[in-house]
Structure formats: C-alpha cells, structure tokens
Amino acid sequence: MSPPLVIKNGTVVNEDGMFKADVLVRNGIIVEVSPNITALPDTEVIDATDRLVIPGGIDPHTHMQMPYMGEVTKDDFLKGTEAAVAGGTTMIIDFCCPDHRNGESLIAGYNRWRSWADPKVCCDYGLSVAITMWRPETAEQMAIITSPEFGVNSFKFYMAYENTLMVRDDELFRGMQECAKLRALARVHCENGSVIKEKEIDLLAKGVTGPEGHTQSRPEEIEAEATNRACVLAAQANCPVYIVHVMTKGAASAISHHRAQGSIVFGEPIAAGLALDGSHYYNEDWLHAARYVMSPPLSRDPTTPELLMKLLAAGELHLTGTDNCTYDCRQKSLGKGNFTKIPNGINGVEDRMSVVWEKGVHSGIIDPMRYVSITSSTAAKIFNIYPRKGRIAVGSDADIVIFNPNATRTISKDTHHHNLDFNIFEGINCHGVAEVTISRGRIVWAHGKLQTVPGSGKFIPLLANSPFVFSTHEKREQKIQPRIVERLE
C-alpha cells in the first residue's frame, strides 16, 4: 500500500469548477479536498504550485495486444498502459474482439483478454466487447457478460472490414435490440464495408496500390452515410448509441441531426482526428503515408480538426479517445504493392492529453473545465464509474494528474513510451504536460520517469444501466409501444 500523499498549493479542476485546494490521499482514495491541509510526518508531499490538479485521463478506445490480419498490435497491456500513464491517462477501456468466425464465444474472448491484461496493466482498465457476427447463443452470452461478475456495459459493432469483423444491418439491429434490453451501450464503427470492398477492387485494378488508395476507397460520405444509418437503426431499437472515432464533418453532422431529433447519441473524436489531416496519405514516402493508415481515414479537409474541437466545445461531440492500435514499420510494410494489406492503426494513448490541451485549451476553443469533461469525466459517466473516476472529490479514486499548463514538449518517437518505431504526431509541439501521474494513490509517472509495476492496475467492472445514458429509457420505451387496431369481424 502506498503511503499517504498530500498535493499542496495546486488548482483543482473538475468539469464543473476550478478552485485552489490541497488534496489528501490515503489508501488509494481521496479523503480530503480543502485549503491548507497539514501534512503529517508519514505523508508524502507534492508541491503543485502553478499547476493544475486534474482527474486522470480516461481513454475509452484502445486496442492493446490485439490480433488482426495475422499480426498483433505492438503495444501490449504493459507497454500500452505505461505509455498511457506517461501522458496522464490513468484508465483505458480496451476492446475485446472474440474470434467468432473460429467459434470463440463472447465469454471465452473476454477471459482471453483478461488473462492478457491482468498480469501486465499498470493502470486501471475496463473492457468493451465486440460482436462480429450473430449466433443463436449471442443474446444469452450478452446477458451473462453484462452481469456484475463480468462487468461489461458496452458492445462494439463494426460496419467495416467485410468477412472479418463486419456485421450486417440485421445483425447490428438485433444487437442493438439486445443492448437496449440489457441497458448496455452500443458502440459503432461507422463505414460501409461492402461499398469499400468494391472500391478497393476498382482502385487496385486501376493501378492504385499505395496508401493513397486507402483514403480514396473510403470517401468521407461513406462515414457520414454509415453514421446516419447507425443512428437510424439505434432509434428504431430504442438503443443509445456511441459513435467511435468521428473523423469527418459529415459524420459529426449526422450525430447532431439525430440528437436534435431526440436520439441518445454520443460522438467520440480521437486525438489523431483533432490534430492531423489526410494529406499524409499522399506523401511521396510510401512508409510515411502508410503510418497514417487507419479506418475511417483522416479527413482530407484540413479544416476538419478545428471544427471537431469546436463541436466538442459546443457539446455536439462529447469525449475524446485515441483508437490506439499500433503497428510498426515492418508490419505496415506488409501492404507494399496492395494498400488493402496495410494493417490499420495508429498511436495516441500517450499523447492525447497534451494534444487535446494544445488544440483545445491553448488555442482558446475550450476552457480547462471542458477539457476535464472531454478527457475524463464524461467517459466516467457514460461507462457508469462516476464519481469514482473522473473527479477530484472525497471518496473518488486517487487517479490524479499534476498538469503543467505552461510547460511544452515536442512529441517524438525517440522519447515516447510506445513499443513503436514511429509516432504519427512526430514534431508537434504541445503546451500542457503531465508532470506527475497518480494511479489509485500510487505515483506511476513523475518528472519524466516511469515508476510502474506490472499488474498493479485493476480491472474495473463497468456496470450496466448507466444513469447518464439510460435515465430516460423507460419513458422512451413507453412511447414506442406498437399500436393495435381492434376491428369488427
């Protein structure tokens, strides 16, 4: 057990306020937040003068140690969570993708992910489970896995990657119906896999083999169409829906439209989409271009990143993730001669907190309180762990970051903590640096050095029926009951 800890002289920032206060931590829990706390002799003291004391970041979208396309992502649960805490993130929600096509059940896939993660994680984590095909037993397994024993309250559905991860519309709709029954959140990757497949075939036939083919096979309208379709299906199922990695203006517009109609829709842009654009796919250096291959691809419109940040400021989009899914240069090079074989994925879990501060707060678009909301507290609310996570308050877990808003750092593969030989944010200078990261009362990162212990992180059960998501569900259900007309024979 870590010794008691007091953070002195800092400015506490929550989503709903900023104030000067000290923070006392004991046994991994915040036990006091008030001015002028006296440090007892056995208490470790951190001076946070001119620093912000913020809730640790929650990254709701990672793929650590994920097998796909015959490869495995380079960040396992140790390296991935080390990178996370080095950047000020104290919890990740990773996607478990059971191998349905080879007969693996949801429960077996869940157990496989737990066996990988539990011995390695150095910060807390939760799981979201992907459903990649519908089987007769799927609904029953969903019910089991949403029990407190398993602690899963969201399921992911892919509208892309035909013949591997993609579900048909009828499968997606059935899955959403089950999610609604279980009070679990449907999370959707929005593309049109069937159209993409045809466009890939056409582009290759025309001699387009490089990474530029990836973005050309996935026009921005495809993400927008799929986002609209996912929202329509969710509304028909009376199921709240969470759109992962919102990359384009059209997708964001579809979310806003459906929210205006009364649907419960959450939009998650990612760090890459808030800082970069799709010009990288046309770089003459093949490997440079391949490093940015992800799906949906980065927007071709250079004004999109700023617009997405403004939509976060306005509450039209709601939280930030990373889709951290790292493949190194050797793995990316497997797609030379055929862009469809380039493994899709990028880094982000270490740099999200600084990138969002730079592009959001330092640029003047959002304030520090909104920053806390979109990097931590909204995720905690959606996944039903607030205020245990996502808040500096008595009784909350001591997941805390001492954040220097005036410090700068230049992102580089030479200094990052990913198991990766490049960084898509290479050379970006960011204001806002996590100087100290505390995970449940344990200092895991301090002034440029990791102090992590593999396995010290904990699996956090994510319980179904989050009030933030489902508080109006029963009323909505009553309004959409089928109507029966009684007729005389």
From Swiss-Prot:
Zn(2+) 2 binds at K156, H189, H245. Binds 2 Zn(2+) ions per subunit. It holds the Pfam family Amidohydro_1. Keywords: Hydrolase, Metal-binding, Nucleus, Zinc. It is an enzyme of class 3 (hydrolase). It catalyses: 5,6-dihydrouracil + H2O = 3-(carbamoylamino)propanoate + H(+). Homotetramer. It comes from the Eukaryota. Its EC number is 3.5.2.2. Substrate binds at Y161, S295, N344. One of its GO terms (molecular function) is dihydropyrimidinase activity. Its main location: nucleus. It is found in: Nucleus. Belongs to the metallo-dependent hydrolases superfamily. Hydantoinase/dihydropyrimidinase family. GO terms for biological process: nucleobase catabolic process; pyrimidine nucleobase catabolic process. This is Dihydropyrimidinase 1. Carboxylation allows a single lysine to coordinate two zinc ions. In L1-L2 larvae, expressed in body hypodermal cells, hemidesmosomes and in a neuronal cell between the pharynx and ring neuropil. In adults, expression is seen in body hypodermal cells and pharynx. Its cofactor is Zn(2+). One of its GO terms (cellular component) is cytosol. InterPro entries: Amidohydro-rel, Hydantoinase/dihydroPyrase, Metal-dep_hydrolase_composite, Metal_Hydrolase, Metallo-dep_Hydrolases_sf.
